[in-house]
Amino acid sequence: PEARAARWVTLLKAQAQLARGDAAGAAASLKSLTADASRPVMLMSADLALAGAAGPGGELALKRSAEDLQTRVAAKPGDVLAWSLLASTWAKLGQPLRSLRAEGEAQYAMGDLRGAIDRLRAGQRLAQGGGATDFIESSVIDSRLRDLQAQQRALAAEERESR
C-alpha cells in the first residue's frame, strides 16, 4: 500500500510540475517510475514527451511514446485519452495522416460517430492530396471509414423504423 501511495504522490508531483511549466522537473520526478509500465505512467510520459521534456532526445521520446500508445490502443481501443495523446504525438512527429486517424478513433471512442467520420474523411482528403503518403495508413483509414459509415447507415435505418 505504501509503495502504491508513493507512486501516486510521484505522479501527482510530476503532473503539478508539468502544469506549472516545469517539464524538466516533472521528468526528474518521473524518473523513479521508469520501470513502471502502468497506464498512468505511460500517459504522463507521453505528456512529457509532448512538452519537450526529453531535450535533445525529444524525437526519440516521442517515437517511444507513440509505440507505447499504439500498443495501448490496440489492446484497449476505447481509451479516449490514449488515442488523443497518440494523435498529438503523431502530429508532433510530422505524421498528419496517422494523427487524423487517431483523432477519428478518439472521437469514436467518445461515442461521436459523426466526428469520427469527419476526421477520417479529412485523412482521406489528405491522402488524396498527394505528397508523401503512408499507403498502409491510408488503407486503414479507408477501411475504418467504410465501417463507420455502415454503422451510421444502420443507425439511421433503425431511427427511421422506430418512427
Predicted regions and their residues:
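Terminal, low-structured helical/coil segments at or just beyond the last alpha-helical repeat
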Residues: A109-R163
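Alpha-helical linker/edge segments of TPR/alpha-solenoid repeat scaffolds
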Residues: A19-G25, A53-L62, K92-R101, A132, ...
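TPR/TPR-like alpha-solenoid repeats
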Residues: A16, L48, T89, A106, ...
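Extracytoplasmic and endomembrane cell-envelope/extracellular-matrix remodeling and assembly machinery
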Residues: P1-K31, A61
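Structural register within alpha-helical repeat arrays
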Residues: K13, S45-G52, L86, E103, ...
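Solenoid-like repeat scaffolds
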Residues: P1-R4, K31-R39, Q70-P77, T89-L93, ...
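Inward-facing hydrophobic residues that define packing positions of alpha-helical scaffold repeats
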Residues: A27-K31, L62, A66-Q70, E103, ...
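Generic helix N-cap/helix-start motif at coil->alpha-helix transitions
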Residues: E2-L11, D36-M44, A61-S65, G78-A82, ...
